[in-house]
Amino acid sequence: LTQRGAAYYPPQSEWGSQDEALVARDQRWGLVWGHGPHRVRYSVAYDPEEFKFALNTMTEEAKVRLLMHAYACDAIVEDGRISGVTFQSKSGRFAILANVVIDATGDGDIFTSAGAAYEKENVLPWLWFGMGGVKNPEAAIDAGGWFFHTLGEGRVLLPWGATERVTRKIDATDPDDLTYAELACRKRVMEEVDRLRRESPSFANAHVCHIADQIGITESRRLVGEYMLGRDDVDTPCDDVIAITGHWTKY
């Protein structure tokens, strides 16, 4: 991504710095936000379309067999363990058996169908979007707008959607709730676009570049596993760590 000019992130030598100028620079990119005290974090602003291409290239190079346009349905449970998953495609229903199944649905669809225990919380829906053709984005950001600088000339990213957000919490596993949220959020997006064109000179001739493909949610189902992470675990390094976040957590 960096080679293609499709990513921006602070160099490792700056990570952890509390230099106000560096923090302010990264805030403009949306790499630092939330409650202080602030410091430079490892966080990346990237072009989502370029990111998709990079992921496709990486999986091909790793000899991963991809199967798109097929949707996971139910876990196949044998002797108390998941031995495979059924899928639905336009060619019909089929199953894939495996020694290890990883539920990467984000909503626990597979472990739920296997009967695993979970917690669930209703959340506010979001719909991020980007605009192009913005005249002098830096001046627009300086004026106090709720948007970030992003990759590409004259473009900004509007996080969490419009200023006037949807205030009804939804069950992110309920299709009726998701339908309501998508329609409501898309309406808010266009209202925000019209407002910015009307009120901000920088956006007078701006246009919508991209609206997020899916409703943004922070969580839905949480697996009740052998060990449940709690607030005391937030700053505790783990030997089996698999991911790092540069941002806040409410837990």
Q: Each predicted region: which residue ranges?
A:
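Flavin (FAD/FMN)-binding glycine-rich loop and adjacent Rossmann-like elements that form
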Residues: T2, Q12, G16-V32, G36-P37, ...
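Conserved FAD-binding subdomain of flavin-dependent enzymes
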Residues: Q3-A7, M58
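A structural motif corresponding to the C-terminal end of an alpha-helix
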Residues: M58-R65
